Amino acid sequence: MNYNEIGIEALNQGNIEKAAEAFTKAIEESPKDPVPYINFANLLSSINEFERALNFFQKAIELDHTAAAAYYGAGNVYTLKEDFMKAKDYFEQALKAGMENSDLFYMLGQTLIKLEQPKLAMPYLQRAVELNEEDNEARFQFGMCLANEHMLEEAVTTFTEVITRDPQHADAFYNLGVAYAYLEKKDEALEMLGKAIDVQPDHMLALHAQKLIQEAE
């Protein structure tokens, strides 16, 4: 194994010190290779050394402006720092550099939601689900965006898929109930809100919505 592989293995085993040592040696061995800088940056990010991590990601980008993993890593750091505008910029750069995986599309969608741009987030979350059908959280967030844009029939379909895959997803039951309420399907709305409460008895939003619908009858 080379030093990068040794470092990644050590990092996966939780041996931060050994990983740092290996990545340092990899940088010394190949100072013009962006990969060990990215690896070291990911290590620093994992222990919340955000500023140092950004310095290493930046070094990797200086060495190779198409290093998609460096842009993606920096985007994650800015997300953790709650600087969502910078996070969005770096995730977009990762996309331009050729990265195409579900995590990137999900993170880009999430940053746009944080920036209160759910309409722009929709295609990214949809793509995240297309690339990884097991990503139920991306599917749920996509449903939330659909509901926000009053695309209620599509939201119902999406939330139904979420609860089919995860029958314990209280928020999906709640939002499905709300969507049915807006579609004036009271029986279905009450059924879904009831299921949200079954899963999470202290779900205040579901309890409140259930009460409103019952009082309106």
What are these regions (language model features)?
Residues 12-25, 47-59, 81-93, 114-127, ...:
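Structural signature of tandem alpha-helical TPR/SEL1-like repeats
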